[in-house]
Each structure stands twice: as C-alpha cells, then as structure tokens.
Amino acid sequence: MAKPVVAIVGRPNVGKSTIFNRIVGERVSIVEDVPGVTRDRIYNSAEWLGKEFNIIDTGGIDLSDEPFLEQIRAQAEIAIDEADVIIFITNGREGVTDADEQVAKILYRSNKPIVLAINKVDNPEMRDQIYDFYSLGFGEPYPISGSHGLGLGDMLDAVRAHFPKEEEEEYPDDTVKFSLIGRPNVGKSSILNALLGEDRVIVSDIAGTTRDAIDTTYTFDGQDYVMIDTAGMRKRGKVYESTEKYSVLRAMRAIERSDVVLVVINAEEGIREQDKRIAGYAHDAGRAIIIVVNKWDAINKDEKTINVWTEDIREQFQFLSYAPIVFVSAKTKQRLNNLFPLINQVSDNHSLRVQSSMLNDVISDAVAMNPSPMDRGKRLKIFYTTQVAVKPPTFVVFVNDPELMHFSYERFLENRIREAFPFDGTPIRVIARKRK
C-alpha cells in the first residue's frame, strides 16, 4: 500500500516551503553520508498521529522562465495529478488576491479533497481577517503560522481525515512486483513494450490499488510478475515531459509498491544528476535495484566501452555498489532476455533470511580480523547480531555503546555480510543497539 500523497499549492510567496519544512520537521536534515545520494526537498516523508504520508512542495519547483500564470497552473497540475489531498495556502496579511482566485479555479476541477490554509496569521487578533477566504468556496479556512508553527495541528487533522482508506495488495506473496524508473525519454516505455512482446508473456491490464496507476500482470517461465506503472509512462503531459524534476514524483509511487526497481539510464545522454536523484529515492526506500543502461545500440563502442561505462557508473552511483548493471537495447532487444532472471535473483536476495548462527560466525570472524578502533579510551564490543527484517535485509548488532559504531566500521561489517551471503542487488541495513 503506497502512502497517501499531500501537495502544498498556492501562489508564490505565501510560505509554502516554510510550511513544508514545518510538516516534514527534522527529516529534511537527515542526509546519508554517502557520495552520490542527492537530496531534493521537493518531495519528502512526514507523519501525523501515527499515519505516514508523502508531501510535495510545489514551491520547490523552479519555473522561473515561465509566465506567472503558467507557474501557478503548472503547480496546480502537479497537485491535481499526484495528490490524494491538496493543501491550498493563502496569505492572511494580503487577503484574497486575483492569483488566489486563479488557483482556486484550477483546483475546483480537481475533484480532490482541498484543505484551505490561511498562512501568516501570527496572532489571535488576525483571526478576524480570515472570513474573506470563505469566498474561495473551499469551506472552513484554517488559520496557521508557518513561521511560528501555530494552527498546523488542526490543519493536519483535516488533511488526515481525507486520506483514502487503506487497501491490501491483491497479489499473492510469490508475485514479483517491479517498476522501471528514470528521467523522461530514457526508454522506459520501449523496454516495457519489448518485454511484453515476448511470446511467453501473458498480459492483462487491471486497475491498481493506487490511484492513477496501471498494473500490468504477466507470467514468464512460470513466474508471476506485476509491472507497476504510474500514469507517467502512459500519459505524457506537457509539463512532466518538459521538466525533469516531475519524473521523480511519478517514480515515487511506483517505488513504494515495488520489490525490485529497474533504474533506466540513456546511453546516448550519459549519466545525469537526475538519474542519481531518482536512484537515491529507490535506495532510500530499501528496494532491490538493477541499473539498466538502455539505447546501447545507439552509441559507438569498442571492446573497452562496457568496462569504461561500468567504472563510471560505480564511481557516480557509489551508494548502489550492490546493484548489478545490464546494458540493453529495447530497439534490438539486446540482452533483454537477461532481465527476468536478474529480477528473480535480486528479488530472492531482497527477501533472504540467514541463519543466526552463521551470521554470528561471520561477525565474530570480522571482528577478530579487524577490531574496531579505540574511541576516547573505549572500544566497541559486539555481543551478538540478529536479522530482524527482510525487504531489505536488516540486521541489528547488539553492542556495549552504539555511539562507538562508526560509519566506516558499520560499512566494514556490511561488506563482510555481503561476502558471506548472496545479497547482490539489494541494500542491507546494519543497526547498532545497546544490549540491555
């Protein structure tokens, strides 16, 4: 079940980003210290009263080259397409403006729940000024102050009340769910169509449990698959095609519902920052990952080209050192037959559970070979390790003091675990806990 999506919409300078940061809170500042993981605050996770959701800050989208009305229209279009609930932000100090009414006209047509929030109501005396906003036609306005954090609780209560009811996935546990993600025009649709063109593939399109998604179910060599596709691959909106940042929004829902994510790169264009950003979301979500370099037929090659590309990918995607790389051509179908076996392999690894005795032997040998360094006269002591989860495989290491588990030593233990067990294609998590 994908998390609900909330979009913050409003004309420029009403405080959208301030409210976004208030709602997201400290999560924005959590940055993994790994080269290549690029953070973009346009999209983040948040929680209210135990319910997690994703939130889009349309104010983080740079449309400065577009005319003013086009900026507003584009922001509203994102919200209408992507969100389950829309927060419409206005400025209480300025009253209802023509631009607010323009936004309202677009939002009327969305048929989405809309919570109207009046920002910059910084003291109780200003509450009398909110009544004009009833004229926008969205019911009770919620007075808030993004800068002081006032009124956000009532607003979020209203947002949470509009979340769609949770639905269980309707697919058997042994079905492998995967998605293709990447920038526009990297060839995701072409790869999908080439895969579905195989004789042994049985295709049926059914509506997915997630709004605006189409799940393609099919069977290949006796294994059932679900290709999770957001509308972005099938419905090409002008705004989405023209601005690469929007492809991240399209990818997020697919990532959340997938077991395996194929990150598609265009060989003709090379590696772009947006490729790394999208891949970073899949990594952070803990999904199994395959890097697929498409349009391999379209570039000049010699016997060294694959090695040069592989080294470049490993350098630029250091956080995906575990992900296998496949060089394919959707046009000629070169190496496409490798994808299904690889999807199966990384899916199996993603859900692999290892024996505790073997795991602890591996950790003991690792510590004996390379004890942790001293820190302020103290040394990390590992008592035992246990696997607490799969998808992704997650290991808790019980220690004398978690503060002594440095990032570099955590990475060392992860590498020893990878050497001992088949975890190709899947991230693994190593968490230090104090033994009680």
Swiss-Prot record:
Single Gene Ontology MF annotation: GTP binding
Function: GTPase that plays an essential role in the late steps of ribosome biogenesis.
Keyword Nuclease: no
Domain KH-like positions: 352-436
Residues the record lists as binding GTP 2: 182-189, 229-233, 294-297
Occurrences of domain EngA-type G (ranges): 4-167, 176-351
GO biological-process terms attached to the record: ribosome biogenesis
Transmembrane segments: none
Coiled coil: none
Pfam families given in the database record: KH_dom-like, MMR_HSR1
Keywords: GTP-binding, Nucleotide-binding, Repeat, Ribosome biogenesis
Alphabetized HAMAP family for the sequence: GTPase_Der
Quaternary structure (record): Associates with the 50S ribosomal subunit.
Binding site for GTP 1: 10-17, 57-61, 119-122
Designated name of the protein: GTPase Der
Family: Belongs to the TRAFAC class TrmE-Era-EngA-EngB-Septin-like GTPase superfamily. EngA (Der) GTPase family.
Source organism phylogeny: Bacteria, Bacillati, Bacillota, Bacilli, Bacillales
